[in-house]
Amino acid sequence: VAKRSPLAEKLDEVQGRIAAACAKAKREPGAVTLIAVTKTAAPEQIRELLQLGVGDLGESRAQQLSQRAMQLNEFYQRRKQHGDEAVPDKLRWHMIGHLQRNKVKAVLEVASLVHSVDSLRLAEELDIQAAKRNKRQPVLLQVNASEEPSKFGVAVGAAVHLAEQIDSMPALQLVGIMTMAEAEESEAKIRHTFVRTREVFEELKWHKIGGTSLRHLSMGMSHDFEIAIEEGATMVRIGTALFGGKPGDEVMEKE
C-alpha cells in the first residue's frame, strides 16, 4: 500500500471529524461542505488536494484568489481532459475574506460564492458588476454575531433589513449567511455566536427572504468547526487543520 502523504492524512482526519460531528448532530455527513482555505498552502499542496477530490477552495484576499484560480484552473482542466477520476466534478472558488469594492471586478471573474457581503455599498457594487457580466452571483450575508469590534459583518439587528435589500438586487442571489467566531473564546461563547447566526438564518427563512435558494450557513473554522456543525453549519472553512499555521490564519481582521 502506498504511503499516504501528510496532507492526505490530515484531510482524512478532518473529514472524519466532520462525519463524527454530523453523526452527533443526527445530520447526514453530506450535509456539510468542506472548504479548504488555501491561504497558507503551497501550490503543490493545492494540486494534491484537487487530486484527493476536494473541489471547494477558499481565499481571504482578492488578489491571491485571482492568482490561485489562474494557476489551479489550468491544472484542473488538464487533469479532467486526461480523464483523472480522482479530481472533483467541479472546482469552486470561495471568497471568504473582507472584500473592498475596488476588488469586486477581479473577484467576480473567479468566485463561485462570495461569503463576505457585509454592507449595502458592497452589495450594490457586486450587483452592478455582476449585471455587466450577465451573471447572477451567489452571495452570503456576513453577520457579526460575536459582536467583536475587530470582526467584519453586519450587526445582528440590521441583518434582516440588509438581506431584504440584497434579495431585491437582480444580479445577486442570496443563498445564506456567514459568520466568524472569536478564536480565543470559550466553547460557550463560540456556540452562542453560531446559535445567534442560525437564529438570523431562521428569521430570514420566516420572512421568505432568498426563497428556496437560502440554504447555506457558512460557519466554523479549524478551531471550532465541530461546534458549528452541531449548530447547523452547511459549509466549514478549514485552513490550519490541513496546512498547519497558527489558529486563526483563516481569518482576516480589520486593519
Region spans (language model):
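Conserved alpha/beta-domain cores
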Residues: 1-225, 231, 243-245
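Active-site loop ensemble at the mouth of alpha/beta enzyme cores that anchors a bound cofactor
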Residues: 235, 249-255
